[in-house]
Amino acid sequence: MTFTRARRASLAAAGVAVAAILVAACSSSSSSSAGPVSSASAGGGASGTAAGTSIVVGSLPVLDTAGLQVAIKEGFFKQAGLNVTVESVAQSTAAIPDLLHGSIQVIGGGNYVSFLEAQAHATFSVEFLAPAVDCTTNDYGVAAMPSSGITTASDLAGKTIAVNLTQNIQTLTTNAVLTADGVSTAAVKYVEIPFPDMVAALKAGRVNAISAVEPFLSAALAAGAKLVTSTCTGPAANFPMSGYITTQTWAQQHPAAAKAFQQALEKGNAYANAHPSVVRTVLPTYTSMTSAAAATVPLGTYPSSLTVTSLGTIATLMKSGGLTAPSDVSSLILP
């Protein structure tokens, strides 16, 4: 797969923006150049035991993080001795300063692309604790209003598409699908609009199309938009989308808690896959979805574990798309 020089430049600039967020977060800390802030007491609990550890997860209110909500509902974290609470965030990278300063310990539903690029820029030592979701054909795509005249992927050439973050999994997979369909991505313009604001922007004509995940894709379709293309097809079929991220410092200082969180979350994912009705029950509790919408929304796949192979697949696509990715991802996954 090849991408145009203009698109590579655009993605590279987006990567610099992520790095700027990270540099600002680090420089605003009282710590020196020793690295991200993460005190030994952050999150509570002794380093050798998980019992009594409090973990705050800055989590996106999307279907990606259903496994987290299921794990809380089914008591998997409590069984592991963890006290897990969730704070909703609109963008995963916006939660990075809180992560580095220790007010949250984990980012939930963070797209792999942004955090792999952060690691590659050596401004943030990333530790992936567990996977959140892999995309399926029906739960992630590009939508447009009927009046736009956009009905197929080829119609997106020269258009403006809203994404939650310009340097993330959305731009990468959308470009991959468009390229596979013979569309030049050089003229495609991406603008950052938080997921909750995408439908309003689309209806107001501020963008030609949106690249959205659930429940926001279903909200757009309910508002009259039409699905143009899934972004989980072709080169992006069953693509690993997002995961749960912490700092390597926190994971090293709290190894028992980190491992307990990983295992409880993986139980939550497995339970979510086996009991979709439970997922549909929890969705209205942390997303904007109604119970009626949750009953029919397409669900993704919640992987039981994050593998070097799946993370390497992302890194490979990143490099072919003009983004910077670590050459070795094996050390970034909590064993």
Language-model region placement:
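Bacterial N-terminal signal peptides that target proteins for export
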Residues: M1-V16
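C-terminal motif of bacterial Sec signal peptides marking the signal peptidase cleavage site
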Residues: A20-A25
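Bacterial signal peptide processing site
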Residues: S27-S30
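Short, glycine-/small- and polar/acidic-enriched structural segments
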Residues: G35-V183, E192, N208, L227-S230, ...
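Solvent-exposed, polar/charged alpha-helical surfaces in well-ordered, non-transmembrane soluble domains
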Residues: A66, V70, E74-G75, A94-P97, ...
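Pocket-lining segment of extracytoplasmic ligand-binding domains
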Residues: N111-V113, Y190-V191, P196-V282
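Secondary-structure end/capping motifs
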Residues: Q252-L323
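Conserved C-terminal helix/tail region of periplasmic/extracytoplasmic solute-binding proteins
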Residues: M318-P335
